[in-house]
């Protein structure tokens, strides 16, 4: 049996289902490239048959990723498998992942079929998927609650049909480690062709046991773990990639397996996913939380100063958390900025140095000192704003306080024109939003507003994340500035530009549809 555990990341498929607003294709690609740098073996990036947008994102990612295997999900239906194969065919290497429920409650209540019918459906789905690729994965949905005799029959049949990976999900997070490990142990003892496939596990965290169940399964012979960055996912989430990777690395003495994960990329990837998905990492989250390497107890501090391993079983550096607090100022040159970014894991060529340096100088003039977390924030925001903006904030002024009604004046570039608007509101942010909405003419409802501090003290940057609803769709926007009102305005302008692009796409599709109709007449 192999001593390597395959890491199958499903952040962009299962993880995205938990998000307050869908990611754009560009944002998904940004995460996919980060996952590739992290060293994931397989990345499941979407469910192509579910929507044209999902199909497009899977196809875009499949075309760009070279060092990881790209996977798409499909039900055990030919139309689903066709869509997955079509989206993936541009990839250097790809996998089709098809699934079917096997538990009694799912078979009888959801599928309304006999288990024999389900068994035949599973066999047919795997055989059909094998027409497109040798790399087919089959999942027994709700395996954790499937009678073991039925589960063994399904696994054996799927392997005989051509599945090279068999996934055993604890779909509702119901099992405990000894129980789930026992299921894997049973499969290895009772399925005669088990050596012809890799056994995978996909555990949910409804009882807080997803990571523990996954590790128990690995100890019993599973050699693929399906997981997400920061453990994001439906309901209580999925198995946390960073926790599994660091457990297998830290306790290799006990478990005896390894992964291909580049551990120094963990923190950077976690932060990117958190920011793009608008899902803050809880401070006490293992491995990547803000407090994961903090020591407040005097006894602990004394011990760590004498020998770090008294209270630290892993180092911050091992997950890419650079603790160097070297401050940068407006007197720092381009070479220094390039050097700092390289130390943070951003090689030259992965960003526009001139653009970053200009933003850095503007921030340094405001703050005096700029820290590593400021640089990463500037880099992140420069990357998501590379596309030309139809709407651009040029100027804003706000008056408020005491008995004065909040009043704002905003000047924006709209296409090639410049438009100015003034408005009052229930506070300075609302007044600015009233101005922006008047300028754009969009009727927007802000359903979520979140303010986070990026840094320490009075000069910290304020990051504003909002979710806005427009014509039944949700759009996500972010802004970053030392002034909260300014970062709030930036976030709404980000939303406005996303809406504008969506409307442009819809208009293009409508014109294309009309042209197609005319050509058929």
Curated annotation (Swiss-Prot):
Cofactor: Mn(2+)
Gene Ontology cellular-component terms listed: cytosol
Pathway of action: Amino-acid biosynthesis; L-leucine biosynthesis; L-leucine from 3-methyl-2-oxobutanoate: step 1/4
GO BP of this protein: L-leucine biosynthetic process
UniProt cross-references to InterPro entries, sorted A to Z: 2-IPM_HCS-like, 2-isopropylmalate_synth_dimer, AIPM/Hcit_synth_CS, Aldolase_TIM, LeuA/HCS_post-cat, LeuA_allosteric_dom_sf, LeuA_bact_synth, PYR_CT
Role, per record: Catalyzes the condensation of the acetyl group of acetyl-CoA with 3-methyl-2-oxobutanoate (2-ketoisovalerate) to form 3-carboxy-3-hydroxy-4-methylpentanoate (2-isopropylmalate).
Subcellular localization, as worded in the UniProt entry: Cytoplasm
Chain spans, region Regulatory domain: 392-521
Subunit-level organization: Homodimer.
Binding site for Mn(2+): 14, 202, 204, 238
Protein known as: 2-isopropylmalate synthase
Gene: leuA
Intrachain disulfide bonds: none
Family membership: Belongs to the alpha-IPM synthase/homocitrate synthase family. LeuA type 1 subfamily.
SUPFAM superfamilies per UniProt: 2-isopropylmalate synthase LeuA, allosteric (dimerisation) domain, Aldolase
Lineage per the UniProt record: Bacteria, Pseudomonadati, Pseudomonadota, Gammaproteobacteria, Aeromonadales
């Amino acid at each position: 049996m192999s001593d390597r555990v395959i890491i199958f990341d499903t952040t962009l498929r299962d993880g995205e289902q938990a998000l307050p607003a869908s990611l754009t294709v560009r944002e998904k690609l940004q995460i996919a490239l980060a996952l590739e740098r992290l060293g994931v073996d397989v990345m499941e990036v979407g469910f192509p048959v579910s929507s044209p947008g999902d199909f497009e994102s899977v196809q875009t990612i499949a075309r760009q990723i070279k060092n990881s295997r790209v996977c798409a999900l499909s039900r055990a239906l030919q139309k689903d498998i066709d869509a997955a194969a079509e989206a993936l065919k541009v990839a250097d290497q790809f996998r089709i992942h098809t699934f079917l429920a096997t538990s009694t409650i799912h078979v009888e209540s959801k599928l309304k079929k006999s288990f024999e019918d389900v068994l035949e459906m599973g066999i047919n789905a795997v055989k059909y998927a094998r027409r497109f690729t040798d790399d087919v994965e089959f999942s027994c949905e709700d395996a954790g609650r499937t009678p073991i005799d039925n589960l063994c029959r399904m696994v054996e049949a799927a392997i005989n049909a051509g599945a090279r990976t068999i996934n055993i999900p604890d779909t509702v997070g119901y099992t405990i480690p000894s129980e789930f490990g026992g299921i894997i142990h049973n499969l290895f003892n009772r399925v005669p062709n088990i050596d012809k496939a890799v056994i995978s596990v996909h555990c949910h965290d409804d009882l807080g046991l997803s990571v523990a169940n996954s590790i128990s399964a690995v100890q019993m012979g599973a050699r693929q773990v399906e997981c997400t960055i920061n453990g994001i996912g439906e309901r209580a989430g999925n198995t946390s990639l960073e926790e599994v990777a660091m457990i297998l690395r830290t306790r290799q003495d006990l478990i005896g397996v390894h992964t291909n994960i580049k551990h120094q990329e963990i923190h950077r990837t976690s932060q990117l996913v958190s920011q793009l998905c608008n899902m803050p990492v809880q401070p006490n989250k293992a491995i990547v939380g803000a407090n994961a390497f903090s020591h407040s107890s005097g006894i602990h501090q004394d011990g760590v100063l004498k020998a770090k391993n008294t209270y630290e079983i892993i180092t911050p550096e091992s997950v890419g958390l650079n603790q160097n607090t070297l401050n940068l100022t407006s007197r720092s040159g381009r070479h220094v900025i390039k050097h700092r970014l390289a130390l943070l894991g951003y090689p030259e060529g992965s960003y526009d140095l001139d653009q970053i340096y200009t933003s850095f100088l503007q921030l340094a003039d405001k703050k005096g000192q700029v820290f590593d977390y400021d640089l990463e924030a500037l880099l992140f925001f420069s990357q998501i704003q590379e596309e030309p903006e139809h709407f651009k904030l040029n100027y804003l002024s706000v008056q408020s306080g005491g008995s004065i009604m909040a009043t704002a004046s905003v000047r924006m570039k709209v296409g090639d024109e410049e438009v100015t608007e003034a408005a009052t509101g229930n506070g300075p942010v609302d007044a600015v939003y009233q101005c922006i909405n008047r300028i754009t003419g969009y009727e927007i409802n802000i359903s979520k507003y979140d303010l986070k501090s990026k840094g320490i003290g009075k000069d910290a940057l304020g990051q504003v994340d909002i979710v806005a609803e427009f014509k039944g769709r949700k759009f996500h926007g972010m802004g970053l500035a030392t002034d909260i009102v300014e970062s709030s305005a930036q976030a709404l302008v980000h939303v406005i530009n996303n809406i504008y692009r969506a409307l442009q796409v819809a208009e293009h599709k409508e014109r294309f549809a009309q042209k197609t109709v005319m050509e058929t007449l």
